[in-house]
Each structure stands twice: as structure tokens, then as C-alpha cells.
Swiss-Prot record:
Keywords on record: Bacterial flagellum biogenesis, Cytoplasm, Repressor, RNA-binding, Translation regulation
Family (UniProt): Belongs to the CsrA/RsmA family.
GO biological process per UniProt: bacterial-type flagellum organization; mRNA catabolic process; negative regulation of translational initiation; regulation of bacterial-type flagellum assembly; regulation of carbohydrate metabolic process
Classification via InterPro entries: CsrA, CsrA_sf
Role summary: A translational regulator that binds mRNA to regulate translation initiation and/or mRNA stability. Usually binds in the 5'-UTR at or near the Shine-Dalgarno sequence preventing ribosome-binding, thus repressing translation. Its main target seems to be the major flagellin gene, while its function is anatagonized by FliW.
Chief location category: cytoplasm
Record protein name field: Translational regulator CsrA
GO molecular function: mRNA 5'-UTR binding
Organism annotation: Leifsonia xyli subsp. xyli (strain CTCB07)
Quaternary structure and partners: Homodimer; the beta-strands of each monomer intercalate to form a hydrophobic core, while the alpha-helices form wings that extend away from the core.
Pfam families: CsrA
UniProt keyword Cytoplasm present: yes
Location in or out of the cell: Cytoplasm
Length: 85
């Protein structure tokens, strides 16, 4: 990992297309601005981790929800079937 010290207004360049600017320093935090091509995805790590956790949670089996879905689909199918003659 490359560790750099920058002051407000100074920039860091990554490759030819990405520019990071130190906008402000406040207490123990800093504000940065990132200029990058539209095709480059930029995410905060905590947001990425929250999305991954939510996706894992959504992918887990829920037997109660499965039972409810099957019951709803069965009721719908029975409602659509014409009565026997």
C-alpha cells in the first residue's frame, strides 16, 4: 500500500484518468473529490459491504416465505381453473 500525505488542494493521480483532490480537512476526517471516467465505479467501502450483506441475506432460504408463495400461487391457479362440468 502506498501511503501519501497531502494538504488541502493537493492532488493524487492514478493512471491517466483518475484524479483525487483533498478538498478539506476537519478534525480526524478529510473530504476528497474524485474525478474519473464514467465507466469507473467508485464506492465507499462501508456501502459496498452493506450491499454485499444485504444480497447475502436476500439469497438465504426462508421456508415460511416459500410456503406462503406456494400457497398464493396454488390459490391463484385454482381461481383461474374453470369449474368442472
Amino acid at each position: 500500500m502506498l501511503v501519501l500525505t497531502r494538504k488541502q488542494g493537493e492532488k493524487i493521480l492514478i493512471g491517466d484518468d483518475i484524479e483525487i483532490t483533498v478538498l478539506d480537512t476537519r478534525g480526524d476526517g478529510i473530504r476528497i473529490g474524485i474525478s474519473a471516467p464514467r465507466g469507473i465505479r467508485i464506492q465507499r467501502d462501508e456501502v459496498r459491504k452493506a450491499i454485499e450483506a444485504e444480497n447475502r441475506s436476500a439469497a438465504m432460504r426462508n421456508p415460511a416465505a416459500e410456503f406462503e408463495l406456494i400457497a398464493s400461487l396454488t390459490a391463484l391457479q385454482n381461481a383461474e381453473d374453470p369449474p368442472p362440468r
